[in-house]
Amino acid sequence: MSQEPSIHTWPGSYYINSEKRWASGVLSLSRTTLRFASEQKQESLMSLKLSRIMEIKMESSSIIFSALTVLEQGNLKHWFGSLRPCRNAVYHVLEHFWRERLLSPSEPQGAEAPLSKGQELISLISGAQRRLEDTGKVLNHQGEQFDNMIQGLDKIESDLTVADKLLSELECPSWWPFSKMPWRSHQEAKSEAAAKAACTKGSGKIQKVIVSIPAIVFRDGNTGNMKPGSLTLLVSSLEVREANGQLLHCFEKEEVDDIHVFNPYEISIRQRFIGKPDICFRLLSARMTEALSVLEMQYKKKVEVTRDYAVFRSTSATTPESPESGGNVWAAGHGQDTEVPVEVPAGELTQLQLQVLQPTVTEAEAQELKQMLQQLKNLALEAETELERQDEALDVLSCSTDHATMNINRHTRRMRKLL
């Protein structure tokens, strides 16, 4: 049976626990499997279905400074080190495809003995709970930083108030009979009004979003800076954003020069310039097929399919009955969204009916799930409260910073006039 083509590969090393040694080779990610092959003999040292992965983490050990670990069902942990271009890039790509695999509504059951539905849910919720706890710690630390920044701005405001009083003393000495010195003008009032008008300037029109998908974003040629983000297709533009929503670049429809499709999960978008470097972003996404159909309609003359894409289409065509190829998210090529009906023999129909009627979650698992969901709900509510508080703190910081900047500029102009 032919091996699935790789979506992405990384040179690195794998720890063979039975031999207590590290082996160099290549880590490869395919549509359904994570593999590691040795560099010398080209033999597979590890092959793991994405559906069996429970957790992906970045860790450190006494043997190697930094490593990437993959926890398999059965509490079996795989260690990867010396990953190039960097560990963070590999982590972001693996986590993205693994998460999309978990969230896929058409996730198939593997050929090996699978866990029950209740155990799968417990495993998924426990992972989400751990991540939410880590997020809560980060949010608390971030909130403390915001509080320190607000205290610092309050101190700056008090210092500016003292500076204003001292400048007023210098501008209007007690021996001067008038309220203002003759060299003062109305320029300050005009500049302040202009600054306020700039702050209250309205934003532009909001375009309609056609489709938005999560993706791994990086500049073409800089694979070491892979980070999670998103690709948003609008009516007249394309937006590439970071995971926090910050806009990296907006390609207007007429500015896009070419879109290369490397495989069903990876594309590049380029805007060419004369006399300066081109702007080119490369995007990896497990849901890229959702965007490809729109891109082919909007940019049909600019979309170019590479030869690597044909490998994925031919592989999927030769293995239509693969148990791991289900759903449009994991279809290897465009146009495989339709499911082929399977004929069931009459003798096996009763067995299928009995299998459907069997309970998928036991009462004990349901009780455990209920408790875990309650804990997850409490953590989410605490995180939401902290986020709302930090949103208010950010508004205060923004207003205080603008006010302090305006006062500093005004005091600077006043001091220059006094010199």
Swiss-Prot record:
Q: Which organism is it from?
A: Danio rerio (Zebrafish)
Q: May I have one GO cellular component term?
A: SNARE complex
Q: Which family does it belong to?
A: Belongs to the SVAP1 family.
Sorted alphabetically, the keyword list is: Coiled coil, Repeat
Looking at the record, the residues that make up the t-SNARE coiled-coil homology domain are 108-170, 356-418
Put simply, this protein is called Synaptosomal-associated protein 47
PROSITE patterns, alphabetically? T_SNARE
Q: GO annotations under biological process?
A: exocytosis; synaptic vesicle fusion to presynaptic active zone membrane; synaptic vesicle priming
- The signal peptide annotation in the UniProt record is none
Its lineage reads: Eukaryota, Metazoa, Chordata, Craniata, Vertebrata
**Biological role stated in the UniProt entry:** May play a role in intracellular membrane fusion.
Tell me the SUPFAM superfamilies matching this sequence: SNARE fusion complex (SSF58038)
- Tell me the superkingdom of the source: Eukaryota
- What one GO molecular function would you report for this record? SNAP receptor activity
Note whether Coiled coil occurs among the keywords. yes
